[in-house]
Amino acid sequence: MTDNERLAQLLFGDGGLTPEDCEQRYPERGLPEGARVTRFSPSPTGYLHIGGLFGALTDVLTARASGGITYLRIEDTDKKREVEDGVSAIINGFKNFGMTFDEGVTGFGTESGAYGPYTQSQRVEIYHAVAKRLVEEGKAYPCFCTAGELSEIRSEQENGGADITGYFGKWARCRDLSFEEQKRRIEAGEPYVLRFRSDGDENRRIFFDDIIRGKIEMPENVIDEVILKSDGIPTYHFAHVCDDHYMRTTHVIRGEEWISSVPKHIALFKACGFRVPKYAHTPQVMKTDEETGAKRKLSKRKDPEAAVSYFVEQGYPKESVIEYIMTLLNSNFEDWRRANPDASCWDFPFNLKKMSVSGCLFDMAKLNDVSKNIISRMSAGEIYGNILNWAKEYDGELYSLLSRDEDYAVGIFSIDRDCPKPRKDIASWQQVRNFVEYFYDEIYTPDFTLPENISPADAAAILKKYLEVFDIEDDKDTWFAKIKEICEPLGYTPNVKEYKKNPDAFKGHVGDVSTVIRLAITSRRNTPDLHSIIQLLGRQRVLERIENAVKEYES
């Protein structure tokens, strides 16, 4: 038995799981050639970030496009940063947007799939099996350096102007300890971590092909990275290498902030005898800073929209958020959407190679436009159901009003909907209260403010004249014809073109007359079809509102 084998036995004991056992437990997946296996692997350290939804969508689309699979893995090795219900927050965040995975964690303590456990803290036996093999082969060793000693090394490097800082070369004090020294210190109970023994050379370069960014050249890794912490829990760098191998990940898709870690990850894959996966490093999700006008990364602290829960609370349909993210993922999505207006966004032929290299800009105005288009294609019944579900949790008063009379509420959302160009007033369900308030007396507050070109006296005259001809039974054409008829006696022309030719000859035109009537009934200058609104409100409420407006203008 070699010293390395004796060291491995001292560190991990006899027997136990071996890498060969893991190979049998987690065989190749047997998917069709070219099928991609991707994973989304968040840490339960807080809410699901919009960048997380962006990344997960990239993983899912990549796998689906190739006939592969995507799994959800929870990377919970950093217990200090883990928050209570962090896993549930991630799972619920995905559920709110209809995001599903083929395998992996499905809830707190639940999962599905043959390559689990899908939570890293439950896979320690696997990491120890691989770490033990690395020790046996002389590729890993125990390091007894204290925090103070490591700080001393870093200070020495920084003061000496070293190009690279870290535990390597002459600063790797425990790298070449004799087995006898290692054994003595372990048996004495000295705490230690396990480090990877790098064979990198700072003068050599590595090259790898990033699917999004093309060929990337970087210095080799020379750092003897920690792979097991003093409590035996693996570091992120080591755990994900083992997991991606035994879960048979073919494509590692992650944020561009991980590019600098690729050399150490490739070194670990090769040292373990694992096949190196394909890499794709996605751009960060950015926004324009309101104060400086410069682009910056979305901030959990500054930007409420950084959390996907924000879009749920605001009432954005899940389809709207997913579709908007699609526009960020591939620049040709919008062209595809115009050519396929009725297709599901999941039918889009997503391509990693068409992702932007620079940061993609999250634009709330653009999201609102996308969402208005999505909602405009919904039926009145679909809109009603969606709003009711949202309002039940976030606006109890609105929920009570809408659920009181379903037919009436659906009638509201039917106005200007079944037509070639449906209105696009609503971007999120939170906006519905403002949209429907004049249909419900309980939340309606009259506003009698007139346009500058119409005096209160003229407004009162228009409304009194309208009351003379008003008939709730009139169809739309008859109703509007009557509005035109009352124009001339009041000094207004029923012909807008005539007014534009000779504005001094009239007080205004039929549009001004209609505006006064619209304001009296809804307190809005812009609404869906006014005739339809009148039919829904009914004769009594229309008369009451007009009469109240007349009193206001004559007072």
Which residue ranges define each predicted feature?
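N-terminal Rossmann-like or analogous alpha/beta NTP/dinucleotide-binding catalytic cores
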Residues: 2-162, 260-274, 320
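A generic secondary-structure signal for well-formed alpha-helical elements
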Residues: 19, 94-101, 135-142, 154-157, ...
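Short amphipathic alpha-helical segments and their helix-coil junctions
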Residues: 35-39, 71, 303-306, 344-352, ...
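Glycine- and acidic
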Residues: 38-45, 71-76, 246-252, 305-308, ...
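Residue-level signal for inorganic ion chemistry
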Residues: 59, 90, 134, 138, ...
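Active-site cores that bind ATP or allylic diphosphates and position pyrophosphate for catalysis
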Residues: 133, 141-281, 286-298, 307, ...
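Catalytic adenosine-cofactor/nucleotide-binding cores of aminoacyl-tRNA synthetases and other
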Residues: 272-453, 522-555
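Helix-rich, typically C-terminal accessory recognition domains appended to large enzymatic cores
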Residues: 482-537, 541
